[in-house]
């Protein structure tokens, strides 16, 4: 392992395990470390180690932009949920601010778009009509598991993306995996858990189902575009918080049945 990678991983380890071990930057190019963290959307994690580095000012500026984007997406999440819940449309918040809540500083987890899952077909169709009626514009995209919408706040001109999922993940070539995923994440099977974020209560996947979803989500990223440290941090921090509520026997069985056991190390 290269020294640069070792230093970066130690910084992530400190974050994910709540450690405060010193991470000397001797022998590591700070500019290269900055670029690596930027590539993995984790620049704010460098703040405790970069106070004496020439990149510190740029690092603080980038962090401020991430904080602004975080709260803007939180507002977009709240707005979208309020529209759907007002019409009694059952939906689940995937990833996003629900995973960021597990970080020591949630705002340091970079957010991209908003992902919602609606397992009921009729409810999904109703949701699409409601979104269209409230200024959400459907974006052309080839997807086998979600519809993409774009919403622009007229006051600021800032636009945000919503991925509205009718399947939890894309379709596999292995039919048994599709059958199992459809069964586990069906409307009849799923019973929501709830998290309170900034005074708003959101329905989310139960811990066992969420771990299984995150494994499939990581696999899809690995197969099509690769994945970086953010997904691993998400997974680690989620398990740190919810491991006692996860049925690992079920995870073990589901992973074997869907042929993704190579991504899951059962201990």
Place the predicted regions along the sequence by residue:
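Conserved NTP-donor binding/palm subdomain of two-metal-ion nucleotidyltransferases/polymerases, i.e.
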Residues: 1-112, 118-267
């Amino acid at each position: 392992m290269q020294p640069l990678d070792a230093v970066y991983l130690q910084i992530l380890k400190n974050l994910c395990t709540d450690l405060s071990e010193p991470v000397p930057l001797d022998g590591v190019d700070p500019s290269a470390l900055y670029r690596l963290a930027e590539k993995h959307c984790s620049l704010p994690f460098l703040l405790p180690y970069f106070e004496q580095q020439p990149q510190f000012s740029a690092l603080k500026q980038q962090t401020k932009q991430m904080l602004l984007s975080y709260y803007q997406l939180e507002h977009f999440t709240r707005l979208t949920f309020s529209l759907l819940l007002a019409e009694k449309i059952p939906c689940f918040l995937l990833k996003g601010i629900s995973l960021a809540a597990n970080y020591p500083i949630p705002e340091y987890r970079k957010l991209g778009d908003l992902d919602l899952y609606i397992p009921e077909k009729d409810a999904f169709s109703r949701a699409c009509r409601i979104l269209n009626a409230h200024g959400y514009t459907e974006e052309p995209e080839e997807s086998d598991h979600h519809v993409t919408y774009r919403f622009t706040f007229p006051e600021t001109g800032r636009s945000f993306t919503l991925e509205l999922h009718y399947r939890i993940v894309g379709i596999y070539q292995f039919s048994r995996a599709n059958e199992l995923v459809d069964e586990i994440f069906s409307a009849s099977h799923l019973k929501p858990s709830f998290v309170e974020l900034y005074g708003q209560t959101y329905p989310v996947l139960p811990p066992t189902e969420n771990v299984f979803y995150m494994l499939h989500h990581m696999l899809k990223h690995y197969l099509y575009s690769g994945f970086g440290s953010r997904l691993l941090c998400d997974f680690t921090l989620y398990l740190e918080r919810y491991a006692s509520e996860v049925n690992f026997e079920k995870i073990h069985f589901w992973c074997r049945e869907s042929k993704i056991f190579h991504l899951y190390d059962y201990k």
